[in-house]
Every structure is written in structure tokens, then in C-alpha cells.
Amino acid sequence: MTAPHHMPDLFALSEINGPVVRPGERAYADEVTGFNLASLHTPDVAIGATGPDDIVTAMRWAHATHTPVAVQATGHGANFPIEHGLLINTSRMTDVHVDPTTRTATIAAGAKWSHVMAAAAPHGLAGLCGTSTDAGVVGYTLGGGLPVLGRAYGFAADLVRSFQVVTPDGHLRESDPRHEPELFWALRGGKGNVGVVTSLVTELLPLPRLYGGGIHCHAEHAQTLLRTWAEWTHTVPDEMCSMFSVLRLPPIPQIPEPLRGGFWARVAVAWPGDPAEGQALIAPLREAAPVAVDTVEEMDHAALDRIHMEPQDPLPARECCMLLSDLPPDAMGTFLEQVGPGAGAEYPLLVASLRHMGGALSRPSAVEDAVCARDARYFMESVGIMPAPPVAEAVEQATRRLYTAMAPYGTGRTMVNIHGTPGDEQDIARAWTPEVYARLCHDKSVYDPDNLLRYGHAVTPA
């Protein structure tokens, strides 16, 4: 663990209702550890915020003492170590209030999508969740939020109506299209560069049920399934959402039989319309190659986790992504050369995927935001598990090879939530267009001129 350096007096933090812990104290590890165990956090002090007042107190102390600040709810996006400074843990702030009349939800900073689903489902409503309901709502949305049903409804940031946010000067602000509009712009897609969100209000959708799941073939059929899927994506309605993946699943109890320990090619689909129509639409995928496991069925929207079967337990992971301008045959060939059967069963990436973009994801938000993935036709992402240093190095090498090989087909940009470990300023800027990045840097200089919020995917004040 990194030794703490000299810290300013902590007396002001005694006003915080939640715990305040330092390295060496019994509760420290639980307070700072996130879902992604690849990043070891060693802040000099961590607070467990119980509400907006705690965050205001913490930010005023940080501003007065020039202490850098990091924020974590679930830690799914923890692709960087938090060293020194102050960590604000919002995981205790899980309140969700659903207004069925306005079809909106007010969601506190630490709430997971599972909390939102549970509160919204009795009203026949749902939010634009990503591939795991275990992820935090706020961090996901600040990065734009790429939903499972994105082609049908757009980015999660598009549905946000307002934020309550504490800016680095310690002021609690309300931000919407009419009040603090520039702050509202930067918070939707600009990640946590201009403040610490205490809650947001977002629209919900009347989505009680959907038709979805995965069509799994043995990996020897990956080429046939990929080419069929790619051609099929040019024919389907905007509401059909899908992703092709190559999966090397470990033989662990958390993975259900018969998928456990297998090497698979999979197309995951999600269709919010009539199940009979969805069944007809995916027929070409079921006919493309011998299907070993088919989990596609009508389900409650709250059961969305069954579609992509993301891990539910913390693990050390390396994730990365790339926006693709298209997916021509040579791009498919390159992808499979890197991750398919030819790469070997011992290839270290757990999953490498190609997601169909377009549809509502390509349409501008009704209110301008900082999301910069609307021009991508496809989206590539990968995850490697790193339980030990030799495996970690193999994962890093495989990741570099994959993204170098696929670079000719990319737009040159990433998505901030799945960007992976942020590098230098040039690398960080790849999550946005040059124009949006410059605007974010300007906003950073207005709201956070001292760069207190400097951890993770942080831009530089102009």
C-alpha cells in the first residue's frame, strides 16, 4: 500500500455523518475497494457519504486544503488507481423515487440499476440500463451510458432531465437545460470533470417486458456466425439491438452449465417489441450455424442481466474499446484472426465483442450534450481477467495487438466509460471530438480551475 503523505487537518470532516477512515484503520479496505480489483486504491482519507450534505462538507474541505478528490459508487469503472487525496464513496446513497405520472425517477448518487429496476417495475417502467444492473447509475450516465436497448432509445444521457451536483467550490447546484445549462451539457457525456453528482432525474420508459438472450455456437463456427450477423445488421429495424462476441469462459461455478468452461461464438439480442416479430427477425441467426445453447426468450425487463450474463462478483479486469466506422469483410477477418479459434483456446481475453450501433444512437439528443459516439456504425470492446502478474501481461499484450490490428477500421475515438486505463492527455481526449474536448477543458477551467477532480478520465483545465 502506498504510504500516506502529509495531510491537512481533518477536523472539518468530523461534521460528516458517514464514516471517515484513514489507511491502517479496520474499515479502510471495505471503504475504498471497488468492483474492478485490478485497481488498488490508496487514498489518504476516504469518506462514506450518506447524503448531499456530506459531499458538500467533503468538497469544501478539499477546496480549502487543495486536496484532490476521487468519487466511487460501485467501482465498475475503476480502471485507474486512486492514490493519495480524498475518496468519496457514495455507495450508501441508494434512494430511488419513481413518479409514475411523469414517468421519471430521482436517483441518488450510489444507486445501482438494480435499485432502479426494482422501483420502476411495479409501474411497468424501466430505465436505459447497460449490460449489468449491478453497475452504478450516475457514473454510467455521466459517461453517456450505452444501453442494451440503445439502438431503440439512444444513450442514457439523452433521457436525463436534471442533476443535483456539488461543484469543486463546495456549492450545491441544480442543473438542467434552463439552470446552469453549460454544467448540464458537460455532465451528460463529459464524465465527472466538473462536479460530484448527488442525484439525477431521468425519464423512464414503458418497458415491462422484452425479447432477448443469447444464441451460442461453438467457436469453430465463429466466422459463419459473424458474417451472417454483420450482413443481418444491415437489414434489421432500429429497435433490434445486438452484439457479436467471442467468449472463453472459465470453468467456475458462477457460469451456468453448459456454457461453463466453453469456447463460444455468441450473438446477444434485445428486442423491445412484439416477441413474435422478434422471433422472426432473429431467424437468420438461428439458422446460420449449429446452435448449442439458445437463451433467447420473452422476459421481464428487470431480468435484463440474463442477456449478456456479466460477472456479478468483483474481479480484476482490463477493459478497452474502440468505435468503428464500419465492419467490412477484411475487418471481420482481422477481428477473428486476433480473437477467434486461430488465436488458441488459451488466448487471455475473456470476451471480445462487436456491438451494432446506429438507430437512435446516431440521432442527436433533444438537448445538446457531450456524447461523441453518434457517428459509429459498430463498437468493439474487450475484457481480460488478470488474477496474477503473468496473466496481466498476457492480457495487456493481447489487448494491444487487437486494437492495433483493428485501428484502420476505427473512427479514432473511444467511449469514456469503457476506454480502459487512461493514458496521457492525447489518449484521454480520444473519448470526445476535438471540439467537445476543448469545450470540456474550458468548462473544467470554470468549475474546477484547481483540477481537484483529477482522477480517472479527467480533462485538463484550459
Task: Label every PLM stretch briefly.
Residues M1-A462:
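Soluble FAD-dependent oxygen oxidases
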